[in-house]
């Protein structure tokens, strides 16, 4: 009987931890679309302008011409990004 009580207690703790970890992950995923929507709205409000060509500095992927992304290269502590394929 004591073993059964102990197993139920352990199962409850593990289930609680699983639910807490899953809910934290869900909040992180829900936040991402808002970030992308904000960037997209910002780009729309700036209006039509020329895109940044490959190899030139950028702050956001929206600045780069089509088929290019704003990427940081070099060391993990990279401070400048460039439009790259």
Swiss-Prot record:
One of its GO terms (cellular component) is extracellular region. InterPro entries: Conotoxin (IPR004214). GO terms for molecular function: ion channel inhibitor activity; toxin activity. This is Conotoxin Cap15a. The cysteine framework is XV (C-C-CC-C-C-C-C). Its main location: secreted. Expressed by the venom duct. Residues 1-23 form the signal peptide. Pfam families: Conotoxin. Belongs to the conotoxin O2 superfamily. Residues 24-49 form a propeptide. It comes from Conus capitaneus. The modification Pyrrolidone carboxylic acid is found at residue 50. Keywords: Disulfide bond, Pyrrolidone carboxylic acid, Secreted, Signal, Toxin. Contains 4 disulfide bonds.
